[in-house]
Amino acid sequence: MKEKMNLTALEKSWILYDVGNSAFILLVSTLIPIYFNSLATAAGVHEDLYLSYWGYAGSLATVLVALLGPVCGTLADRKMKKTFFLLALLLGAAGCAALGLAPGWFSFLGIFILARVGYSSSLVFYDSMLPEISKDARMDKVSSLGYAFGYIGSVIPFIVCLILVLMPGTFGLTQGSAMVIAFLITAAWWIGCTVPLLRRYHQTAFVTAQNSRLLDSFRQLGKTLREVKKEKHIFVYLLSFFFFIDGVYTIIDMATAYGAALGLDTTGLLLALLLTQFVAFPFSILFGRLSARYDTGLLIKVSIACYTGIVVFAVFLVSQWQFWLLAVLVGMFQGGIQALSRSYLGKIIPPERSGEFFGLMDVFGKGASFMGLTLVAVVSQLTAGAQLHIFGLTLKNENIAVSSLIVLFAIGFVLFCKADKLNRERIAK
């Protein structure tokens, strides 16, 4: 028990990177969509199209990341993992800092896409470090602590940014200049939290390659796909991950845009999503502790089922207090399902090929995110102006679009049950 409670310096440094990059993703979930809406409004973009354009930008970013996933995964298994991790980090942080320089909504989306690509690419290298940094018995806890402290730690720079944005006049700033400073603060926090990991991490597991041509990365992806099809327990798990994480990522990426499209109060939306971070912190730790007592597969099943219920609730969301309740519910399961999904894969793959398989996981995850974001964006655009009257409520086109996520969670649940059964049978042998 003592080993489980005490983290090594390297594990702490690894967790700290989650604290850094989570500040960016919190900004993506809160202030960035609202700032984009203001730029779009100034350019005369119709309000019914906000959610669609934001969704399309997120979809394009995930397509680019999915294409880069095989390259990042292959590079992560070679000796220069830390170097490529640093390059991805710098792309993401520089993109974050440059968001305030965008002259209009279209260029803003372009810079955002680059920042998102850097962020997501860095996670391939970061996640692949886990099997080297922690033992199998500790992976669930370390992974969960990464998300937990990421949620609570990211609140520190966010509160500073929120004060600047909500009260710019107090500091002699305009709304625009306050946002520029918020982007710079977040980028600096992200880089600062990464320094300990860059200093302490030294790659110990890698494969030797004869050359480093980029095309070999895609050939390796094809080889990995052929091999993983033979490893049915991994393949079915990745398929299930493709569907259920789709819903999770889509909810994270579009929560603020969804609330804003429904006409909810901006300040209330930001404070509600700040509440999500505080709720996610203890519940992420709780899931890490529960994984020591209960099967990881069972906890993932419970999380998927609860997320399905959350989406059903979101479909009928029409008021501010309901959004606050939604924020609490999401916070309860968001960190747990992400952390356990990461550590679940880490347990069923060979450590020396962690980069390869986590790169493949990233392709599946980002491909899913593309599907979810695009699905919501398309349905929202096709039903623009439509209203549905049910149970005495008037649901807008945004409510209708969100309902599409229910199917994805349902498919993910069925496939994960199959994958978990295969892994149990494999362990039993």
Listing of model-derived features with the role each one plays in the protein:
Residues 2-11, 202-238:
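Juxtamembrane intracellular "pre-TM" segments in multi-pass secondary transporters
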Residues 5-62, 233-272:
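Helix-loop boundary and gating motifs at the non-cytosolic
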Residues 47-48, 165-188, 378-409:
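A membrane-interface helix-boundary motif in multi-pass transporters
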Residues 67-80, 282-296, 380:
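Helix-to-loop junctions at the C-terminal end of transmembrane segments
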Residues 83-98, 298-313:
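Structural signature of the two symmetry-related core transmembrane helices
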Residues 100-112, 315-327:
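Helix-loop junctions at membrane interfaces in 12-TM secondary transporters
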Residues 143-165, 364-373:
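Glycine-rich segments within core transmembrane alpha-helices of 12-TM secondary carriers
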Residues 189-200, 402-429:
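Multi-pass alpha-helical transporter architecture, strongest
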